[in-house]
From Swiss-Prot:
Catalytic activity as recorded in UniProt: fluoride(in) = fluoride(out)
Family per similarity comment: Belongs to the fluoride channel Fluc/FEX (TC 1.A.43) family.
Protein name from the UniProt record: Fluoride-specific ion channel FluC
Residues that span the membrane, as ranges: 4-24, 30-50, 68-88, 104-124
Gene Ontology CC annotations of this record: plasma membrane
Gene Ontology MF: a single term: metal ion binding
Keywords annotated in UniProt: Cell inner membrane, Cell membrane, Ion channel, Ion transport, Membrane, Metal-binding, Sodium, Transmembrane, Transmembrane helix, Transport
Primary location class: membrane
Record comment: activity regulation: Na(+) is not transported, but it plays an essential structural role and its presence is essential for fluoride channel function.
A Pfam family this chain is assigned to: CRCB
Record bears the keyword Ion transport: yes
Database matches in InterPro entries: FluC (IPR003691)
Amino acid sequence: MDYLWIMIGSALGGAARFWVTGFVAEQTGGIFPWGTVLINVSGSFLIGFFGSLTGAEGRFVVGESARLFVMIGLCGGFTTFSSFSLQTLNLMRQGEMIRAGGNIALSVVFCLLAVWLGHVVAVAINQMKGA
């Protein structure tokens, strides 16, 4: 049954990624892969937040299937290291070394910050009294 939850989460995450990247490309002109940056940063926040909120010391108890659905399925289908890599390679092949370097720097720094921030927010919620 876990595989089914992972597959459903992956399908939803992939569909959301397709929509968000297309929407962002329309808004920004597609000169820089802002959609992929947004996807990976927000997905990093979500996995850090949900993982810490529902982990062993988390405030919310959810079943392992729910964690698999969100963390492996949804986040796995939503975020995309392969698209980031291909877009960076294409920028490099086009001679856009500054943009390629910017994509690498933005993605790595902001994704690490986002996963940390998601964890910090979840820890703060976990430590709240009541509720």
